[in-house]
């Protein structure tokens, strides 16, 4: 009897990609959804896969992302590691330049422009535009269907349809990336500090203020950060749908939800649209609530939710002013702070939390290394690094979350931990017994 030949990792990853590609192609063929194409024949608008795609199809997409990433790692020579790494900062530099000069906005979504036309209208040097755009094209941002003719790719068209992506780009290039590059200097200068004013952020932006105090004092920074928050909230891993669908909100009935540190209210708006019995109070710092007010004046809230959402200024390091609400929501808040300061935020809620009320924490629960796909873990490690660079904090594993919560008040306990499928964050339900 012939000995069974075991597949090598190279063959395993290749087979996984092939099988998953067939799953997606078959689904697109049977459902009428456009086939994925690198020549843009599938169109510029819409998702790669529709939200209604079966779980097996979305899982196939994730398999391709993971297996292709692992396959590239497998076949990349050690000598190619640094040359390949140089691509990423240049992609970011190109994207910043294009967004700063608003080049994507000058190209019709379904049309073309010449480099000369774009350079003339944007008042930028032609040779710079050509070099920078062609760098971006290697990263699937823009296309050059004919020599010296520029058109949108699916990705760059999305920037036109969603202008706040420009703010996110500028926040990433002008603030987040410089912070990452100052981590060495921060360690050399301050060592194992936990201070919020002794961070890579402070060195990169040249400020003595902690992040959120700087945020409240700098409107331009606030605008960029708001664009980042809006889009991070809408991305798959941090999509609001995981908050909306991941918890049994309907069971609360006519409840009041306090959205602590809720920025411009995107989470509360999404919940209000799905659960008409709920009322919301969105709290954040004065500068953020002012920006939120300006945004609502430009784009009013839908009439169906406007009467059920109110906004107020509040510093969550001070006692919670709203007494006896049913839910206090902390979404993407506590990971910004050290163990001590996160405990202070929770402690400021406790006097206002009635018996049987809930504190819902939606945040990253860091997995043990190697227990999730590399592509997923890499993004979680990005968040962990960003917390270090910005706040001298870090993402927590579940045992750390439990220690934090139980250390605040003996009456608080973790009722359940919900991990919505596809979410990079978990919902930790905390009750006061």
From Swiss-Prot:
Positions of the catalytic residues: 335 (proton acceptor)
Enzyme Commission code: 2.1.1.-
Phenotype reported upon loss of the gene: Impairs the O-methylation of C7 of the heptaketide monomer.
Full protein name: O-methyltransferase VdtC
Keyword Transferase: yes
Role: O-methyltransferase; part of the gene cluster that mediates the biosynthesis of viriditoxin, one of the 'classical' secondary metabolites produced by fungi and that has antibacterial activity. The first step is performed by the polyketide synthase VdtA which condenses one acetyl-CoA and 6 malonyl-CoA units to form the heptaketide monomer backbone of viriditoxin. The product of VdtA is then O-methylated on C7 by the O-methyltransferase VdtC. The O-methyl group is important for the stereoselective coupling of the monomers at the final step of viriditoxin biosynthesis.
InterPro entries per UniProt: COMT-like, O_MeTrfase_dom, SAM-dependent_MTases_sf, WH-like_DNA-bd_sf, WH_DNA-bd_sf
Residues annotated as binding S-adenosyl-L-methionine: 284
Biological processes annotated in GO: (M)-viriditoxin biosynthetic process; methylation
Family that this chain belongs to: Belongs to the class I-like SAM-binding methyltransferase superfamily. Cation-independent O-methyltransferase family. COMT subfamily.
Pathway the protein acts in: Secondary metabolite biosynthesis
SUPFAM superfamilies: S-adenosyl-L-methionine-dependent methyltransferases, Winged helix' DNA-binding domain
Key words of the record: Methyltransferase, S-adenosyl-L-methionine, Transferase
Species: Byssochlamys spectabilis
Catalysed transformations (reactions): 7,9,10-trihydroxy-3-(2-oxopropyl)-1H-benzo[g]isochromen-1-one + S-adenosyl-L-methionine = 9,10-dihydroxy-7-methoxy-3-(2-oxopropyl)-1H-benzo[g]isochromen-1-one + S-adenosyl-L-homocysteine + H(+)
Alphabetized GO MF terms: O-methyltransferase activity; polyketide synthase activity
Class of the enzyme per the UniProt entry, highest EC level: transferase
Gene name per UniProt: VdtC
